[in-house]
């Protein structure tokens, strides 16, 4: 049986599964993998799907961080309005324990937190 190779149509049909989480405004984005004997492909970003799920701002930047030692703590990301940014955090190699804390005083989930393991294998982002 010949190997299956994925077409541009298959790639276009790859979807992001977007789920609301207990923190107000926090979402889990799970990428669908399309794979064959060569490896896999997954959609990292789709403006249309994210917009339909409530993504309100355009992407301002994309960063890549490399951590050399296990157990490293990176820090807390927070900006006061009007400089607040929407972040999409994922892990492309290894794994990370990602924790989100709601620091917005006017939020119904103020001081609540949510944590998930993000990894190269589960294709999740928060």
Language model regions located:
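Short, intrinsically disordered, charge-balanced linker/junction segments flanking boundaries
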Residues: 124-126
């Amino acid at each position: 049986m010949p190997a299956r190779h994925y077409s541009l149509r298959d790639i276009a049909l790859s979807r992001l599964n977007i789920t609301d989480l207990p923190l107000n405004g926090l979402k889990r984005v799970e990428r669908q993998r399309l794979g064959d004997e060569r490896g896999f492909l997954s959609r990292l970003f789709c403006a249309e799907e994210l917009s339909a799920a409530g993504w309100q701002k355009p992407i301002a930047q994309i960063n890549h961080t490399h951590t050399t030692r296990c157990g490293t703590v990176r820090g807390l990301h927070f900006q006061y309005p009007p400089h607040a940014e929407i972040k999409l955090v994922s892990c492309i190699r290894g794994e990370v324990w990602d924790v989100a804390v709601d620091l917005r005083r006017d939020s119904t989930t103020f001081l609540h937190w949510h944590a998930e393991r993000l990894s190269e294998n589960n294709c999740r982002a928060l």
